């Protein structure tokens, strides 16, 4: 197998990249990763320098790919290793740059070693390890991999780390009330009261696929900016990124808005892939009790059902 490094995913190509995937996870798709690069969300200036790997056979056919980045900081990973960086540097080393196998700004489990062939997946991991040695990078981090990848890399000698996420599963529910029926009486009452309080003041509306306009995206970005202004600073994703994915991933987008009269005041952006709905980002321009839960959780559960 022949190893190549790519500073842009476009060098690999959409058909070659997507042809190796075995699921509909939107975040490992060519369109999503290409949009990050095309709209300057990831580049050397942002501290996420793409160095994607590909492995090709003797005929030049690409058999495996890996989303990979040289990182100059630890922001946007949703795994907090700053204490490692501090300890590493106190010991006399330079923690940055490091090598990161990840989907930028996206703490969603998915393939990081993309190939239908287990031997090629192992070869991708070995190639990434070798890059650290040959380029004087401190370490390799592969975050939010699938369980089979996690186990394989552990068997290869990589240190394993576990964390916890909360996922909601649709156990064949026919309606939101059917879901509530599985909860305790007290919890049902609380959720119904929370939803009633929000819906008595605001109107909730969904827009999917071709229904989504640039106006919707502008409103949604204002909500996202509001969240970042209060908590972290500037958003990682640019406004241009959302226009790009509206063009290339339209059928996988689902936006929910809360309206006060004719004015959109809150919302959340969701991605669909296969049998899964991924709630990603959102925000609000007003302070309404339980609005976050309605927009980001209850509406998404209802939509998924």
Language-model segment annotations:
Residues 108, 119-127, 135, 148:
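Residues forming well-ordered secondary-structure scaffolds
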Residues 118-130, 288-302:
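Conserved acetyl-CoA-binding loop-helix of GNAT-fold acetyltransferases
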Residues 69-114:
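Conserved acyl-donor/pantetheine-binding loop and adjacent beta-alpha core of acyl/acetyltransferases
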Residues 1-88, 129-133, 138-290:
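A conserved beta-strand-loop-helix scaffold within acyl/acetyltransferase catalytic domains
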